[in-house]
């Protein structure tokens, strides 16, 4: 497999079609699926809805938003990837209940999950902002998220705008390349448009650092819908929070689980698998991933586990041969991964390779070869 150049910055730099469900908020209008916005809320069970981006493999991604109605207010899990996304969430909540948003839980620091908070605080300034201690620490560093902390940073916003416009133009060029299959060219055209639509909605972005943190667990109690916040261990990031609704048997995982293409980049595999071990001890019937449609069984978790174990196995075997990292990447057999994750064309393979396989294999190979992992927001030793 050739080394893929998509890194975590590509995911966060800007920043599977679905129709409005029968339970969608009437305040959210029907619209095109490529306008850079979250889809209307879908009801999962009594008092619980979620919002997600259109079912495509966009690079300018938006994390899922969970809406939980308790007796005295609404708990949100994540907020979208822009101030405008947060305002959309507020409108969606207003279409479901007259209760205020009382808490916003941040599952992890990646931009597409916490940057909607300012738009929500405009309407609900007293809402609690909650995250793990590690996530709050990372969000307080402007070098990590690349946007201002506490207020917009015009210089950083210009830098991100330039990067987005450059990526959009690159995709338009790929879409015009006659050697690229037409189905893939169509995806490039749509992606180029989506990036610019997301950019249009990101002109006010900045970080609100969570004022309330936890290390292991925290309870937001309620007679009907108690919400348990959990830190089960390191996985996609060093500070992942999961949300468990025991009476509804529903778990929201943040990017610990993402479908149809998992996100991994530079995270070590062993602690991630250990976190999945902890997750599977819960008796959930519904899993809300950080991206993608809800899951009603554990088959995708099994695929995710298989992929991690196979990446690690191949990395160990190749490290024993004395291969260089570049040689190992070239010999890394991704065919079964493409098959199991449904990457059946060049477009889907691009995202699976870039968002998951390349970075995860690099990290696993370096560990197997005894190369110290570079420290960073998500990387570094276990």
Where in the sequence are the language-model features?
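Active-site-proximal loop/helix segments of hydrolase catalytic cores
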Residues: 224-282
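Bacterial N-terminal signal peptides
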Residues: 7-16
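C-terminal regulatory/interaction regions
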Residues: 35, 320-382
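Active-site HxH/HxHxD metal-binding segment of metal-dependent hydrolases
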Residues: 94-210, 219, 313
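Divalent-metal (often Zn2+) His-rich catalytic cores of metallo-beta-lactamase-fold enzymes
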Residues: 250, 273-327, 331
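Active-site neighborhood of phospho(di)ester-bond hydrolases with catalytic His/Asp-centered motifs
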Residues: 77-79, 102-110, 130-133, 232, ...
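Conserved beta-strand hairpin/beta-sheet module of binuclear metal-dependent hydrolase folds
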Residues: 41-95, 241-255
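Core dinuclear metal-dependent hydrolase active-site scaffold
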Residues: 43, 188-189, 203-245
């Amino acid at each position: 497999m050739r080394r893929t150049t998509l890194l975590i910055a590509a995911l966060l730099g800007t920043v599977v079609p679905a129709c409005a469900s029968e339970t969608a908020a009437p305040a959210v209008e029907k619209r095109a699926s490529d306008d850079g916005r979250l889809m209307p809320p879908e009801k999962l069970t009594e008092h619980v809805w979620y919002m997600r981006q259109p079912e495509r493999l966009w690079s300018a991604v938006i994390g899922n938003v969970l809406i939980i109605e308790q007796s005295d207010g609404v708990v949100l899990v994540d907020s979208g990837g822009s101030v405008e996304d947060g305002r959309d969430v507020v409108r969606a909540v207003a279409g479901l209940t007259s209760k205020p948003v009382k808490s916003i839980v941040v599952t992890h620091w990646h931009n597409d999950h916490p940057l909607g908070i300012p738009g929500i605080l405009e309407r609900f300034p007293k809402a609690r902002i909650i995250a793990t201690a590690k996530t709050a620490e990372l969000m307080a560093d402007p070098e990590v998220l690349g946007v201002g902390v506490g207020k917009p940073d015009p210089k950083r916003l210009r830098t991100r705008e330039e990067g987005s416009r450059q990526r959009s133009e690159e995709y338009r060029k790929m879409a015009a390349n006659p050697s690229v299959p037409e189905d893939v060219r169509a995806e490039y055209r749509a992606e180029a448009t989506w990036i610019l639509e997301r950019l249009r909605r990101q002109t006010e972005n900045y970080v609100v650092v969570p004022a309330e943190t936890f290390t292991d667990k925290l309870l937001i109690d309620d007679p009907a819908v108690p919400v348990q916040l959990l830190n089960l261990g390191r996985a996609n990031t060093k500070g992942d929070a999961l949300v468990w609704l025991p009476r509804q048997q529903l778990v929201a995982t943040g990017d610990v689980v993402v479908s149809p293409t998992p996100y991994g980049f530079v995270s070590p595999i062993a602690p991630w698998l250990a976190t999945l071990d902890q997750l599977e001890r819960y008796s959930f019937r519904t899993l809300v991933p950080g991206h993608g449609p809800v899951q009603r069984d554990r088959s995708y978790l099994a695929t995710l586990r298989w992929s991690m174990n196979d990446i690690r196995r191949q990395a160990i075997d190749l490290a024993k041969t004395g291969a260089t990292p570049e040689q190992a990447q070239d010999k890394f057999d991704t065919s079964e991964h493409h098959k199991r994750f449904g990457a059946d064309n060049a477009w889907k393979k691009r995202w699976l390779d870039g968002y998951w396989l390349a970075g995860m294999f690099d990290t696993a190979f370096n560990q197997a070869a005894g190369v110290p992992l570079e420290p960073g927001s998500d990387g570094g030793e276990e």
